[in-house]
């Protein structure tokens, strides 16, 4: 049956390919939010990491500065001695080795701690993402390709891993190194420092030009990757349909177009990114060579007291200065890419949760000595609506399963109403069947009962209570639902049945399977109820999956059943077995049924005929046949869509 949902609108080209290049908005705000997530849980770790980064940077600077002393005070004097004493030199080299050892230990500690910080932060982000995802309304998943959502969990989160574990620590280290080296160079020789800074200005100008181009392509790369993942996921789910209609070549063409789009954006992004390091490295080499020539000339000419040790120490500092500038350029691209991923992550996390203003809850209840309903912690088989009032009092109303629609209008989007003035009721124990052409609104009505969507106008009452006053989790707990698309989870058969009520015993699950007439085929499985199901129950037939879905609804023991296409995928023999089981399951419960075959709803207490979102007929099977209206045409004509 068609679902009357808002369609996802994409940009030009397949699935939005070819639209304008996006830009990261508020990068500073995004970075602040990311670091807020890190500091919230790992502030002490970050302080230690910062200390290690400073220690490592200072060790490198000190080693470079000590080179002046090593050359001028040890090596040069030894060249003028006939029998030089190597002991002082070895002591000096040992001192240099200790300085480098401190730097190595600090860098190792920094790396180890950042692994813990990074993985812990990503774990927390994934938990927040998944927790928030479960609070999102159904319409969010209708409007966003599932593969694109998966891409947020995988690709976008991975860009944050690179940024947190490598880019930001390296950026901080580079900044500290640049400042400390600059001060040291100024102390050694201000003239060579000016020469170095002129070359650095050229490096920064070049880097800015390159990163300004690469940033927009990194954002596009993440977007195109999400679209490709969405397409792959969609085609994997629809492989049977693709093969039935022999659309492999068409599907491949769509994949190639999206894949080529990703290739282009990734090529452009990485072309700019990959050129940064070689360009800055070569400019750094030029800076090194110029400083070496100028310094050597000054030392040979004894200009300003320049010594060989000063030149060598300055060249070491020059190398230490140019390297972090090159790294800053590279890490800037990585951070831009990570911010593009972070923007998608936080966009999903900031999507509005499913609104729920309900305050009426469902509780276990029992009758006291005065025959009044009271709340209890024990499972008694009696459920009651707990209704708090403004005056501070609380009343309990037994859950019966009475559903009433009064003047209900609804549209998936505000400008298009798909249900018009729906008035109907289902009393406890009644079976209400919805029939009509595809797109008439049958599935939409059941979506409104469980509040997957909220109505635009009118009222839906459950046991006399406006369902908008009932907390959604409690409302849905009172409903047993067999969805149009049967979905089973990876796990055993028993676990899938128990999904209907997690505290159900094995005996209750088996009883539910028997009620749904699923026990027979389950017993014939290799491991019976302990048989492992593969992805979405792929190792079961369509009918067997449907039977398990019915058993899953049965174990919940709900007062209201919603059976959306419950027997549409079951053969005639299996349908007869299921129908007998369902008749027993529906006894004493309000049941709303949609079925392909009108023969399955002949025994309904009320059949509601829908057309273009309006109720055009209602009554029992015999009454509607006697009217010889739309239902009569559907029933006797055996129309394909029904």
Label the model's feature ranges.
Residues 20-28, 52, 59-75, 99-146, ...:
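Juxtamembrane helix-loop junctions of ABC transporter transmembrane domains
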Residues 32, 51, 106, 110, ...:
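Hydrophobic alpha-helical transmembrane segments of ABC transporter permease domains
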Residues 40-43, 138-139, 157-164, 168, ...:
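An intracellular "coupling" helix at the cytosolic face of ABC transporter transmembrane type-1 domains
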Residues 41, 45-58, 62, 99, ...:
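Transmembrane helices of ABC transporter permease
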Residues 82, 365-642:
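ABC-type nucleotide-binding domain
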């Amino acid at each position: 049956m068609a679902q009357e949902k808002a369609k996802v609108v994409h940009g030009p080209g397949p699935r939005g390919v070819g639209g304008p290049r996006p830009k990261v908005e508020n990068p500073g705000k995004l970075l602040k939010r990311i670091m807020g997530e890190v500091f919230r849980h790992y502030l002490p770790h970050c302080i230690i990491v910062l200390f290690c980064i400073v220690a490592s940077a200072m060790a490198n600077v000190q080693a470079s500065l000590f080179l002046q002393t090593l050359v001028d005070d040890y090596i040069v004097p030894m060249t003028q001695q006939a029998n030089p004493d190597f002991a002082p030199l070895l002591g000096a080299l040992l001192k240099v080795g200790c300085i480098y050892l401190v730097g190595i230990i600090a860098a190792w500690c920094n790396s180890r701690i950042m692994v813990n910080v990074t993985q812990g932060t990503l774990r927390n982000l994934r938990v927040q993402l998944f927790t928030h995802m479960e609070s999102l309304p159904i319409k969010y998943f209708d409007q966003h390709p599932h593969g694109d959502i998966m891409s947020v969990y995988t690709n976008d989160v991975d860009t944050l891993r690179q940024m947190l574990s490598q880019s930001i620590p390296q950026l901080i280290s580079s900044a500290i190194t640049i400042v400390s080296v600059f001060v040291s160079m100024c102390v050694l020789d201000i003239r060579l420092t000016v020469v170095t800074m002129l070359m650095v200005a050229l490096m920064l100008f070049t880097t800015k030009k390159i990163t300004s181009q690469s940033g927009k392509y990194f954002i596009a790369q993440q977007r195109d990757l999400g679209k490709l993942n969405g397409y792959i996921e969609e085609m994997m789910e629809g492989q049977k349909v693709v093969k039935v209609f022999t659309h492999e070549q068409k599907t491949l063409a769509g994949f190639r177009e999206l894949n080529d789009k990703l290739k282009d954006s990734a090529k452009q992004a990485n072309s700019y990114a990959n050129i940064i390091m070689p360009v800055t490295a070569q400019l750094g080499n030029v800076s090194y060579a110029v400083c070496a020539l100028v310094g050597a000339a000054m030392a040979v000419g004894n200009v300003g007291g320049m010594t060989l040790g000063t030149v060598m120490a300055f060249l070491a500092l020059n190398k230490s200065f140019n390297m972090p500038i090159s790294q800053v350029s590279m890490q800037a691209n990585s951070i831009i890419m990570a911010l593009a991923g972070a923007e998608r992550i936080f966009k999903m996390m900031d999507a509005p949760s499913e609104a729920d203003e309900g305050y009426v809850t469902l509780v276990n209840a029992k009758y006291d000595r005065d025959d009044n309903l009271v709340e209890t912690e024990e499972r008694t088989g009696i459920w009651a609506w707990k209704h708090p009032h403004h005056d501070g009092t609380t009343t309990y109303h037994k859950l019966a399963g009475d559903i009433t629609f009064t003047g209900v209008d609804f549209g998936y989007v505000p400008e298009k109403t798909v249900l018009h003035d729906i008035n109907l009721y289902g009393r406890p124990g009644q079976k209400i069947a919805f029939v009509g052409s595809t797109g008439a609104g049958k599935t939409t009505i059941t979506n409104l009962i469980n509040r997957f969507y909220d109505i635009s106008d009118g009222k839906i009452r459950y046991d006399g209570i406006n369902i908008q006053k009932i907390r959604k989790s409690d409302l849905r707990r009172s409903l047993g639902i067999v969805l149009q698309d049967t979905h089973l989870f990876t796990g055993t058969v028993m676990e899938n049945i128990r999904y209907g009520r997690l505290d159900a015993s094995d005996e209750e699950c088996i009883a539910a399977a028997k009620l749904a007439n699923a026990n027979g085929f389950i017993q014939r499985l290799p491991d019976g109820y302990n048989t492992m199901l593969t992805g979405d129950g792929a190792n079961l037939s369509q009918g067997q999956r449907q039977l398990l879905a019915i058993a899953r609804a049965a174990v919940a023991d709900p007062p209201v059943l919603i059976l959306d296409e419950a027997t549409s995928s079951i053969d005639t023999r299996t349908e007869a077995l299921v129908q007998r089981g369902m008749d027993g399951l529906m006894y004493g419960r309000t049941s709303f049924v949609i079925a392909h075959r009108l023969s399955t709803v002949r025994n309904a207490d009320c059949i509601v005929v829908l057309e273009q979102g309006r109720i055009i007929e209602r009554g029992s099977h015999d009454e509607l046949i006697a009217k010889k209206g739309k239902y009569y045409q559907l029933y006797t004509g055996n129309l394909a869509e029904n």
